[in-house]
Amino acid sequence: MSAASSMDVGPELLARLPALTSPLGIASVAAILLIALFITEKILSVPYPPGVPLIREPEGSRRFSLRTRWQYLTNCQPMFYEAYHQYLKQGKAVVLPGFGVRIEVLLPQNQMKWTMSQPDHVLDQGKAFAEIDQVSWSLGHDKYVVDAWQGLIVKYEMNRAIEVVANSMKDELREVFDEQFGTDTENWKKIDLTPTVKMIIAQAASRFTVGVPLCRNKEYLQNALDTNELFILNAGLTGGLPRIIQPFTGTLFGWLVGSKVSQLKKWIVPLLKQRVDMAKNHPEEPEPQDLLQMMIKYALRERQDEVENWDSMARRIVAQNFGAIHNTQLQVINLLLNVIGSDAEFNTISVLRDEMDRLLGSDDTGNWTKSAIQSMTRADSVSRESIRLGSFGGRAVFRKVMTDDFKTQDGHPLPKGTLLSFISFPAQTDDELYEDGLKYDPFRFSRAREEAASRGDKAPPVTFVTTSPEFLTFGHGKHACPGRFLIDFEMKMILAYIVKNYDIKFPDEYEGKRPSNYWIAEANNPPSGVHIMVKRRAQK
């Protein structure tokens, strides 16, 4: 056969293939996709753990039915309760479907201490979060989660500086609330709560992160909020797809996030260069009291390879913005709805005002100190009760299996690459642990502390930042969320500023009832499109 004739074989074969729009063509494409998915599941995906039951599937099942996966997506809360009461509370592990093709291995709470004691080369938290967040696609590298030193600084440096930044935060809250809630003392204003709180939290958190004036730059703040939305979409969509397809969506989201990072760098890079120069050449000058400065000082000591890598430092700011803004905005929305919704029964707003007037002064001229804010036991209770019921995620204490021979405490082998976790929402609403567990009782935890004090007993460990196997909003153990102390401080300051300076209520059409949260798969979301009414209180 000649070379010319052999080159004609390709077009001839293509001509013989069925058209893609024909029934045979559609069937062929479907068959190819099914074969690809089968190969992905058998070769690329982490196998199902042997011997661990699959919820709502017959004994011995090795994959989830489409029905069970649909139930996870559309009605996950009952599935979580079933997993908790029928398996986990009985000391048994169980597998749940996850988003897309994922599977989730849940261990019982009685194995948590043992699980957390395993070294990182056996069970790794950073690698687990890197996979859950799909950060290698969104930010181009998993180091921003696996080696998240920008977050550890919050724990070890920023928390010590809270006293210094407290009144700066008070000034920032005045600035942003005057703009978002208004200053009218005569007329009620209807607030679209979600976008309003998003901007409030973005500005307040940015005062901690990058300081003035950048924290008031609306383009910068919107950039942070838009990037956070891309992170959530990438984690859900890319993480839920078969591994063979992830490069397509992951690359797309990497490009979208990259464009946001490029925009952010026009603000961050000049600021970084200025701060690095000051730290190196003018150490005698007063230092800005914000996270960016602490990051630079840490990087000069411990990460010299990154300190003048402007792209890497910018991406760490992006990662920190997500941690500082996203969950806090959700919890502040829940907090305000819960305070207003419980006011008729518990007189919540007046009780909080009394405590804050006593600790902060009845006018707005005094300084806000760390000790005063930490003494707000009733505000602490109101906030802890809100996150008990409003945690965004239904699971915590994530770990990724890093070895080939791992077995759980009770002997179940889990394949390398398995993601395991512990259920949180059903444990945090268990009636055996919390009386009327699904009810929002604002002073549930402060009552427990006050009753213990009246008996001369030690206060129970029920503060906002306290974690336990039955209270996992911030995780548990040495890897618990390092930023929870800052979130605690921030939420108390926001709550104090609102109740001291504004009257708040629901619109009349709500008839005094708090709109319910809604679940998307296992994500517990505040109600969308919710409004509140606000009016500035006249100064005494």
Language model feature labels by segment:
Residues 165-332, 351:
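Cytochrome P450 heme-thiolate monooxygenase catalytic core
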Residues 328-355, 482-502:
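Cytochrome P450 catalytic-core helices
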Residues 4-145, 470:
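N-terminal membrane-proximal hinge/A-helix region immediately C-terminal to the signal-anchor transmembrane segment
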Residues 467, 478, 484-522:
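Cytochrome P450 heme-binding "Cys pocket" and the immediately downstream C-terminal segment
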Residues 77-84, 358-412, 418-421, 425-427, ...:
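Conserved cytochrome P450 K-helix E-x-x-R motif and the immediately C-terminal K′/meander segment
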Residues 422-461:
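Conserved cytochrome P450 K-helix/beta-meander segment immediately N-terminal to the heme-binding cysteine loop
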Residues 98-101, 107-210:
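Charged/polar low-complexity intrinsically disordered regions
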Residues 2-19, 521-540:
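C-terminal helix/juxtamembrane-tail motif
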